[in-house]
């Protein structure tokens, strides 16, 4: 974990980064990634994955490891640095890398610059060093996971720090301006100052002390506790103003041990000013002095703030009438005012009541029409208007009865063509009977079937009302419905049982998967067997040379 050597970064090709990314993707669920899996993930256009792997191992961007059961590659910190720097350079954030400014137990800090020559600070998180091995017990980065890579934990730490820095910078806290981040690298503003631990003289230590204590209280009022607020994470500029850095260990004020973390931060500042500047003050904040102003811990999901606490907060602090009004105003573009809604409700209710009253009157039940509210108030109407209204209602009832009669007659309209054909056939049969000497209207047939003769006469009487012209007019009032018999569809049935079809499809898919795995293994493991064969030949050759040397 030495300094980042970026000299080889400019000479790396696209295939090199493709293979390096394949190793990173394989390490999501592998501690040691097999070469066959790397070859299948990289899928180089012209092949040669193992040659690229050997070059990356030579430059210590990946490491070759071999155990009793598996053999493969793993990504190193240098390779992870190269991937992050490549992405930042493609975004035109980082163009050049300078000297190393500082080394800590969790990170390394470098000076970088963009194309315009503007300098920034690059922080590379290095979790898992010898002096910081209890991170999995002290931090909740891994959450419910049991086995997590240190590289992945470094990435989570960088994501948390960038989220904290962005939220604090937007709320005017004295923190560096966040620029960008990728994987475990965070690019931020370069502060022109010195850490407080390197300063031995201050003109006014009381003002610096007060500013530090106010910053602790301001953080707590926003729902956060720094957790590591000491002289190593505070930068003092030329005007003796404090800038706060290093945020991954921040916790929420809802944490069970929040008061202990708060008192520890206060004690660190008190002890430092007493030792370094011989300044002691009786005024210092306590955890009871916190007045909650913001929910920054909810926004950035700080440690100690769980989903259960969020649900409890929603129950304890429900939305008030002001919040509901704001939501209704911002709801949609098609919202109506209260007056418009009331008018529309009155019109809709009056229309429904008038329709209901008309239907009751058509059925024989007299009910007074309840029109608009203005019509209800006008009870003293003249006799002429009452007669006109009753005349209109009688006309309306007559129209309803005519429509009902047409609907009853329309029930037989659908069979008009069939009955027409039947009547024509009956007429032909009657003509044949008359030609055969049997009169159509003879007394014998009248005595045998008198009701049939009556029906035929009735049909002839109503026939003028069932011609083609009237049928077209009556079809306008028909309600078109789908016939059950006509809408039925025949379902095609297969002679092969469905169980047999499922078995065949499953067998075919299994065969395809096995063939794909076989091709991948053959493609990736061929060179591994070649390497083993070369090692065996080398051992045999060396043993033969030793035997010839001793004269055996």
From Swiss-Prot:
Q: List locations, semicolon-separated.
A: Cytoplasm
- Look up what happens after changing residue 380 to A: Does not affect autophosphorylation activity. Does not affect the timing of metaphase-anaphase transition
Which reactions appear under catalytic activity for this entry?
L-seryl-[protein] + ATP = O-phospho-L-seryl-[protein] + ADP + H(+); L-threonyl-[protein] + ATP = O-phospho-L-threonyl-[protein] + ADP + H(+)
Q: Which organism is the protein's source?
A: Homo sapiens (Human)
- Provide the effect of residue 335 to D: Increases time spent in metaphase
Major localisation: cytoplasm
Q: Which InterPro entries match?
A: Kinase-like_dom_sf (IPR011009), Rio2 (IPR030484), RIO2_wHTH_N (IPR015285), RIO_dom (IPR018934), RIO_kinase (IPR000687), RIO_kinase_CS (IPR018935), WH-like_DNA-bd_sf (IPR036388), WH_DNA-bd_sf (IPR036390)
Q: Which Pfam families match?
A: RIO1 (PF01163), Rio2_N (PF09202)
Know the name of this protein?
A: Serine/threonine-protein kinase RIO2
- Give all residue intervals belonging to the Protein kinase domain: 97-272
What happens after mutating residue 548 to A? Does not affect autophosphorylation activity. Does not affect the timing of metaphase-anaphase transition
Q: Name one GO cellular component term.
A: nucleoplasm
